[in-house]
Amino acid sequence: MKLSAKTKICLIIGDPVEHSLSPAMHNAGYEALGIDNQFVYLGAQVKFEDVGVVVQAMRKMGIHGLTCTIPHKVEVMKYLDEIDETAKKIGAVNTVLNKQGKLIGFNTDWQGAVVPLEKITTLSDKKVMVLGAGGAARAVIYGLLRRGAKVKIFNRTKEKAIELAKEFNCLSGDLNNQEEIKDFDIIVNTTSVGMKPLENETPIPVKYLNEKQIVFDIVYTHAETKLLREAKKRGATIIPGIEMLLHQGTAQFEIYTGQKAPEEVMRKTLLQVK
């Protein structure tokens, strides 16, 4: 890596951010393409109230790319010059490109949800159970609907699921109606159940899972969450959260560099640094 004053800086901001695997993933991609003298990807812990200051610094210092993670994906939007239509519909930005001084916001989280599923199946007309109604769920729901899936949202607070379903013009369900779980083609968990301190819990009763289903857990703190382990025992096809991180990252990589991301190199790096 030969950095110079011409090297373009990309930065991930969050609070916290030290756990982020994105710098390792992106820098491995730059190295694989021989452009690690042109781009470097760093991390910075930024408090919520300082997001505007960071965006201003991006403008003044010519920082090339800004990745926003929790809790900055909505807050950053008010400081940008332009937001693409997808990010507007999702209501969050995870990627900012400095295009000759114009700051443009994108959302690649929806690709992180859709691409891993499409490697296994077509999404059109598939019945999908989405667990959760937070920011991550919004990107997942948008992507699934864009691909023609039949989405039903379930959330511990039922009112939030109803509200989100109205906004996206899809269905909401009741977690008490557990028998329904077995009827879905795909189940996507966007909740924090599976992360510490809930790593020994599952967001739904696993006895209803079966071999005809695909179970995708976007939690990536473990290679396999309890939900995925139990789904695998029952013959379901599983997708770990690392795939969501990878594919939102490859889409982002292409926005920042204008080049096709080296997917396998980036996946291998994520698995090594986890």
Regions found by a protein language model. Give the residues of each.
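Conserved beta-strand positions in the Rossmann-like core of class I SAM-dependent methyltransferases
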Residues: 42, 152, 239
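Phosphate/diphosphate ligand-binding glycine-rich loop within oxidoreductases
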Residues: 2-120, 224
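Glycine-rich adenosine-cofactor-binding loop
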Residues: 14, 105, 117, 121, ...
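Rossmann-like adenosine-cofactor binding region
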Residues: 166-238
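Short helix-loop-beta connector
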Residues: 99, 122-127, 210-211
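NAD(P)-binding Rossmann-fold cofactor-contacting core
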Residues: 147-168
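Conserved S-adenosyl-L-methionine
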Residues: 146-150, 234-237
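Adenosine-phosphate binding glycine-rich loop
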Residues: 214, 218-274
